[in-house]
Amino acid sequence: MISSEISYSVVVPVFNSSHSLVELRDRIDAVFKNEMKETYELIFIDDGSESELTWPFLNGLSKKYKEVTSIRLMRNFGKQGALLCGFSNAKGRYIITIDDDLQHFPEDIPSLAALNAHDVVIGRFENKEHNLSKRIFSRVNNWFETKLLGKPEHITNSPFKLIRAEVVNSFLQIKTPNPSLSALLFFVTKDVKNVSVRHAKRPYGKSGFTLKKMFETFASMLFNNSSFLLKLIAYAGISISFFSFLLALIYFIKKLTVGIPVPGYASLVTVTLFIGGLMLFSIGIVGEYLIRIINGVELKPAYVVREKSEG
């Protein structure tokens, strides 16, 4: 629900963090009150943190500062589910997503806000302070987002972004238990801009976004928001069937023109390839229908709230 009193909602997914949150809140507060002169709310989403310190810390922040709202999920639903929870509770005309580890500079928020006439403004990091595996994953993920999700080719995606409330309200109507924020965004709008922002080294602890979670995020995009693999199987089936048909035609022509006998194993291989290709093609077609049916009837929630604390 959009509130006329709040201009910006800042959504921060939190997992096992506490050391960085006071500094993050203070810097965000200074940006909005001293530089932008805008009203804001700060929404922390505790995504099932394993640390027993995280929720009491967030609860304390929301009791101390009227701009802060803290929400605790029942378990770890993943970053995408946590973001959707934050979006559902946001009241601002513009929603900003930022990580909890201080690698994103709150001081760059005005750069995003300067382009808020666009539906989505995404921070493009000038120099990434990620390790090699994260940088590789980011490049691969960006390529697939362009090819599978319709992300404009000139746009680089990142977690640091500004989204107009109208866009958020539109994709919140799409109910899916395995959400991909990128898939939802690029389905709703193509009015997306990049702006250069800074990227800092992580000052506290280690990232909770492990290789396993990277793979799970990528798999969710691939399986739940795209029929790419099914189409790949179908195309492979067609190609194999076509190849086996050509092979059979060649053997048949040789038999008629030259009189070369067709070996038994050759005809067996040809028939096997043809049948196998047809089976793969059929599975792809059936799977295409199946995934559409599942997407239509699956209504499991993307997150479940345990408790909420407001200032």
What do the PLM-derived regions correspond to, one by one?
Residues 15-19, 103, 172, 176, ...:
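Residues in soluble alpha-helical coiled-coils and helical-bundle/repeat scaffolds
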Residues 63, 88, 114-115, 138, ...:
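Solvent-exposed polar/charged
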Residues 1-132:
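Structured catalytic core of nucleotide-sugar glycosyltransferases
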Residues 51, 76, 174-177, 224-228, ...:
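Membrane-interface junctions
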Residues 10, 28, 86, 101, ...:
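Residue-level signature of catalytic and energy-coupling elements of molecular machines
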Residues 73-75, 80-89, 94, 106-179, ...:
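Acceptor/aglycone-binding surface of glycosyltransferases and processive sugar-polymer synthases
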Residues 1-6, 180-311:
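Hydrophobic helical membrane-anchoring modules
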